[in-house]
């Protein structure tokens, strides 16, 4: 990346290449005559960007755009993108891709956010969005006489406000590193079915989810930094709302409605983060028509097994777990990769290229290219290949959703509590699909 920076706080972008050689090397990757960024040049670029971004403050004041991007409406998002396009003379920006509110935009995560715009354009916008989010951090005391969160109010195009009853926080001193939510720690806390169902809330009500990232590097005078954004596994607070009680019980009866916001905050940190099942972004193709302005009154209960039993429109001969039905059950909107894999794994006709190994929730991609081809067809991405598919699988590793089985090629395992969500044990599914344990076992 090259940058020409004046004495004024402006930035001219000449050329860039977005390359992730460490994780996804590709022999046919286009190369350009662009010198490598050194630590000093990166710092120069960062400072130039920050100086230029400061001009957005006047635009915020002029248009009444909230400081916290998670509180932006679709109009605010559009105004922000328009400002960036004019400020940096950006080309090739498709404004239609940014038709979402601020909460959905911030929830995308870097990889998927970058897909919204051309290479260097997306990098610039993401850098600015991160800066805006960090600037909105405010401290709240959590020790002593003020153990509860103050009542928090959130607004968006579709959603209403909710108060948080309290949050139980794990003392940071028990861990040696700032990013201490390690795989081993998460594994000690298997995710419950109630938390699986909170996917519904995370997707239907993105702007009202509370995140409390109590990182050790933010500790100052017994204060923690608390931000309002979608929960990620980086936090370590177990929140609960006034009526929904979090306990490790796998009871669906305790959930009053999929479409209420009684359980907006869950133990996403000390347990596997199932909002990760939706990818960061759980909002790819976030369309307002998929998220009704009024809360539905129906109150379905039970497992996915119960859900499909009452669906006469489902073909009983084709997969046991249709991805579309599972997406509807969890409220995820567009079909996600984990749902698609479950569909293939429960379809007898797909056993030649993907199947259960017979060992619990472990499965094998016998023909990974065919799996990738079908995923690309489902998502209308004809260039999909296994390298790209595996990128999504890798994302699930540190979220304790899916793990790669060591020493076995193309073998993975669901490590989350699928049984409580689906209502099937792995043995039941194996029997229904005539799965025989692998001879290699």
From Swiss-Prot:
GO terms for biological process: cell differentiation; cell motility; immune response; negative regulation of cell cycle; negative regulation of cell population proliferation; PML body organization; positive regulation of angiogenesis; positive regulation of blood vessel endothelial cell migration. CDD domains: SAM_PNT-ETS-1. The keyword Ligase does not apply. Keywords: Acetylation, Cytoplasm, DNA-binding, Immunity, Isopeptide bond, Nucleus, Phosphoprotein, Proto-oncogene, Transcription, Transcription regulation, Ubl conjugation. There is a cross-link at residues 8, 15, 138 (Glycyl lysine isopeptide (Lys-Gly) (interchain with G-Cter in SUMO2)). Coiled coil: none annotated. SMART domains: ETS (SM00413), SAM_PNT (SM00251). It comes from the Eukaryota. Belongs to the ETS family. This is Protein C-ets-1. It comes from Homo sapiens.
